[in-house]
């Protein structure tokens, strides 16, 4: 077991462990092996380690170095999962250091950040510190963020640092998102019987036009001072069963990127406004909406003490857009 405090060697170890998210690639390795590695590493360096695994095979690790008391607590947060190994040029699990850069699956997003947090936390924990230090290394960031949600049901802190790749910019705000499936309902019929059929795909075109108009409206709307305006787009469309029939339904998957003040409820209201306006002039227009994943936007004030301290420490101003 390598318990190195050398960030380059630690990063090599992390890259070499397959941790592809099985929600993205069915049957993929997931996080168990890499969770075992970081648990042993933190235990060796004197941390108390808690393994959270409400979904079997999807563990998140929280390593804790208790403070002496009277100080503020700090949580480091990062994810252990990666996207697919497919399509990688070379062996994705064989890290290569070339011209001062490390190459391997997950290096950028975000095993380099994980290694940096582990080393930093161990360094602080080895010295007197009044506040608790927590390192939350979570499962399933690449799909549903379930790992961080599970951690936050058990732990909190006065401040948190997430070492996602930001090109070393300090990011104090981030957009959220809301996913919806909008299904337009028609009536199936043989292609020779237009009198019996209602073409769901043709009627879905009206919704797509309304969605495009909303996208342009959002682009013109004054937005968040850091994040700018939200946006919306149709991501996936499915409909029909065969070329010789009128389609009974057409489903459009929609993603809405939100800024503070926006939520799944406000997005659903926007979609229903478009759909109801179509129905008002077309009595045959029928639809249903199914909500999907939602992640709320966030914004930390630049005058927040932790924000100011981070900017002073790095001699950087917060990123102007994220």
Stretches found by the model and what they are:
Residues 98-100, 120-135, 211-222, 319:
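Phosphate-handling active-site elements
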Residues 18, 41-42, 164, 204, ...:
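Residue-level signal for inorganic ion chemistry
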Residues 12, 39, 115-122, 149-152, ...:
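Predominant activation on well-ordered alpha-helical scaffold segments within soluble catalytic domains
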Residues 100-116, 190:
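Glycine/serine-rich anion-binding loops at beta->alpha junctions
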Residues 110-179:
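Acidic/histidine-rich catalytic neighborhood of metal-dependent amide-processing enzymes
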Residues 86-87, 171-176, 243-247:
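Short glycine/proline-enriched loop/turn "hinge" motifs that connect secondary-structure elements
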């Amino acid at each position: 077991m390598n318990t190195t405090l050398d960030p380059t060697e630690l990063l090599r170890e992390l890259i070499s462990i397959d941790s592809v998210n099985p929600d993205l690639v069915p049957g993929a390795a997931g996080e168990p092996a890499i969770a075992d590695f970081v648990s042993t590493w933190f235990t060796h360096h004197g941390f108390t380690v808690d393994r959270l695994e409400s979904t079997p095979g999807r563990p998140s690790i929280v390593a804790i170095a208790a403070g002496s008391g009277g100080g503020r607590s700090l949580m480091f947060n990062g994810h252990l999962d990666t996207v697919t190994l497919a399509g990688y040029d070379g062996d994705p699990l064989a890290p290569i250091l070339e011209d001062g850069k490390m190459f391997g699956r997950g290096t950028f997003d975000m095993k380099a950040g994980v290694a940096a947090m582990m080393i930093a936390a161990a360094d602080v924990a080895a010295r007197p510190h009044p506040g608790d230090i927590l390192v939350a290394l979570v499962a399933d960031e690449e799909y549903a963020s379930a790992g961080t949600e599970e951690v936050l049901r058990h732990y909190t802190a006065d401040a948190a640092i997430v070492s996602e790749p930001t090109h070393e910019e300090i990011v104090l705000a981030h957009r959220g998102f809301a996913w919806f499936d909008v299904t337009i309902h028609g009536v199936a019929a043989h292609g020779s019987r237009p009198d019996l059929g209602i073409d769901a795909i043709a009627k879905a075109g009206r919704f797509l036009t309304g969605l495009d108009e909303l996208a342009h409206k959002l682009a013109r709307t004054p937005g968040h001072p850091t994040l700018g305006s939200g946006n919306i787009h149709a991501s996936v469309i499915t409909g029909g069963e065969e070329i010789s029939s009128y389609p009974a339904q057409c489903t459009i998957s929609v993603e809405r990127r939100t800024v503070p003040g926006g939520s799944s409820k406000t997005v659903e209201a926007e979609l229903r406004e478009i759909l109801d306006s179509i129905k008002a002039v077309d009595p045959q227009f029928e639809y249903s909406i199914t909500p999907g994943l939602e992640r709320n936007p966030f914004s930390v004030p630049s005058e927040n003490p932790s924000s100011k301290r981070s900017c002073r420490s790095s001699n950087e101003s917060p990123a102007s857009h994220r």
